[in-house]
């Protein structure tokens, strides 16, 4: 048989199989736009603004609908009621992690972000307990954040009130907090190892949110068969994990089980306690994966929110003035802010919440997956199906947040000026997969922002009317536009 004929027959078979497979799946899944063979709905989705495409689909198909990325169905939840019903009311069924081919190559299912089942539950529980309840050594995590806030202020003083792009400095601070938590000590901002770590994290963050990675996730054959920036990501990950392994070996050589210094020590002690359990998830590979995940989850996300926050405060000097007035009243100028201050600073608390709501860092949320065949609103979602909860549809709900596209701390204040909680506040997602670093991130945002505003006035280089605060959407994240700022010592 001629090779050309064989090729045509193979392609025809693949096409027919794709059509049959999609037809069988679609019968029980929520409705959605009709997918094309092999490529699914990719031509109907704007990869530069996925949320806009999904919002348009929700207007046609309702709050629960199905789209196809390639041949893989993704069930999307739009609006508070649908997101809450899935992630909170049916939390166990929707607690899986929807892993893309790229993330599988990177994590191999290890650590805390991309793991599932028993491994995820045990590693997550241990990490939460360690981060939340245990001040490692003689220093609490709050002490470490306060130390970094002080160092951040000193770095900002070095700008001498000249215009600067705050991206690098604001990236160093959260990364150094993670270094302090996992490696025991922080780094100088000019330390070469620290700068190398920062470079790799920044590079991977940029590449992973590029359209090329979305294409690779939809057509996994490209990952192994074609050159591209995804190979740079995999190389950076390998080098970072090698560095973490070196640090783990140093910790093993100096470990004192009665005096744990940091997260790595705590994990090594847990490994020793479970050394006779052959099925234990506490091993070196999961330790390396978990430490890497702490950096991934705790560096770029917090630094981007800080950067967006300063831009919004720059744009709204009346808000900045009220925060500084509250700082003067509650904290003063001669001691460092602490977390106990937050309950006495309702306006500042509201501002931090509004920064997170408005910045809407991960509009689509990190993908989930159903852990079992799940019936949801008369639809049957097969086990393993990827789920997307559109957090942006909750954070921008106009019934809960009047004028949701306007930055307004009043969204989190009652008529008496007291802080007002909202069930719609989901920047960290919700349910069983809510971000494990939520507590640390909240602490960093409050302490970093209050410490900066305690020590500096903010000045824009441009006319405030021309200062753009509209997010730049890249991949699954929203980033603030670039800007210059002057930190004027108080």
Swiss-Prot record:
Outcome of swapping residue 247 to R: In allele CYP2C8*9; increases enzymatic activity with paclitaxel as substrate; reduces enzymatic activity with amodiaquine as substrate; decreases intrinsic clearance of amodiaquine
Cofactor(s) needed for function: heme
Sites where the protein binds substrate: 100, 204, 241
Induction annotation: By phenobarbital.
Chief localization: endoplasmic reticulum
InterPro entries assigned: Cyt_P450, Cyt_P450_CS, Cyt_P450_E_grp-I, Cyt_P450_sf, Cytochrome_P450_fam2
One GO cellular component term: plasma membrane
Effect caused by changing residue 383 to N: In allele CYP2C8*10; reduces enzymatic activity with paclitaxel as substrate; reduces enzymatic activity with amodiaquine as substrate; decreases intrinsic clearance of amodiaquine
Effect seen on changing residue 264 to M: In allele CYP2C8*4; reduces enzymatic activity with paclitaxel as substrate; decreases affinity for amodiaquine
EC assignment: 1.14.14.1
The UniProt record lists the keyword Disulfide bond: no
Binding site for heme: 435
PTM sites of type Phosphoserine: 100
The protein's annotated pathway: Steroid metabolism; Lipid metabolism; arachidonate metabolism; Cofactor metabolism; retinol metabolism
An annotated GO BP: oxidative demethylation
Gene3D superfamilies xrefs: Cytochrome P450
Location in or out of the cell: Endoplasmic reticulum membrane; Microsome membrane
Family classification: Belongs to the cytochrome P450 family.
Job description of the protein: A cytochrome P450 monooxygenase involved in the metabolism of various endogenous substrates, including fatty acids, steroid hormones and vitamins. Mechanistically, uses molecular oxygen inserting one oxygen atom into a substrate, and reducing the second into a water molecule, with two electrons provided by NADPH via cytochrome P450 reductase (NADPH--hemoprotein reductase). Primarily catalyzes the epoxidation of double bonds of polyunsaturated fatty acids (PUFA) with a preference for the last double bond. Catalyzes the hydroxylation of carbon-hydrogen bonds.
Identification of the protein by name: Cytochrome P450 2C8
Provenance organism: Homo sapiens
Lineage: Eukaryota, Metazoa, Chordata, Craniata, Vertebrata
